[in-house]
Structure formats: structure tokens, C-alpha cells
Amino acid sequence: STALEIRPEIRLTLVQLLSDAAGAFGGMIAGQTLDLYAESVGTANGDEDIIARLEEMKTGRLLRYACEAGAVLGKAPLEQRQALVGYSRKIGQTFQISDDILDREGDQNLMGKTLHKDEAQNKFTIVSRFGVAKAKKLAQKLTDEAIETVNIFGKKAEILQELARFIIERNH
């Protein structure tokens, strides 16, 4: 068996995971649909749980697939696979919150895109609902939790912990 050969049952698992991640029932398609719906009705009635679910179904599902596929290919035991899924959920939400903060107060030259688009489009975000200060606190809490979640991997977790820190510290 070479490194390029992946058993059919593993391929099937990977395709199923990708289908779930992209899907209309809790995946990225559902997240985008909910996002567009929330834009049309406004953000005034949104709560933190709804916004977190929305964020999880977008960026979070993509990151979850990457982590979970790696765990499947690496034949990780269930406990490690679950840790990676938990980690991906937290960094996915952190990424989205950081992106929303940067949209509000980032440097347009560094970002390479027009700022304040979320506000102009009435986007349903933690920042629009609760403000930048609360969003920053939540992003830090999620980052700390993500770092803790992968401690199960010992020294091997360092790259994942660095990624979590990068997501919250990035300026573009």
C-alpha cells in the first residue's frame, strides 16, 4: 500500500463528511441561507446562540471537515477525533468573529477589501449585535478553549495552538 492509496471505506467516510460539511441541513449551504435570511430581517432580535450557530455552519464547517478528515486519514482514536472537532468549532467561530471585528475596525489597505460591509449589508454578527468589546472577549475565550481542547496531543498540539493564536491576532 502506498501513501496515495486510500481504502474505499475511508474514501466513503471522507465524502460523507464533506457532504455533511457542505450540506443544506447544518452545513455551509444552510449557514449561507441563514445568513441571507438574517440580513433580510435585521439583527435586532438575534441572540448569541443563533449567531454562534450561523458562524459554525459557515467557516466552522469548513474547518471541521479539514480537522476531521485529517483525523480519519491519520486513524486517530475517537477521543482525539472528538478533540479535533471541538477545536475546529472553536477556531471556526473565532475566525468569523475576528473577521467581523476587522470589518469594523481593520485597516482597509491591509485587508485588501472595503470595510464596514457587514454593517452596510445588515449582517447578523456578534459585533453588530453586542459590539466590538464583547466580540473580542468571546474570541479570546474561544481561543483559550481551543488551545485547551488540543492539549490531549501534547507537544504535537503546538502547531494547532499557534494557528488558534494567529486567528485571533491577525490584522488582515
List each model region and its residues.
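All-alpha prenyltransferase/terpene-synthase fold signal
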Residues: S1-H172
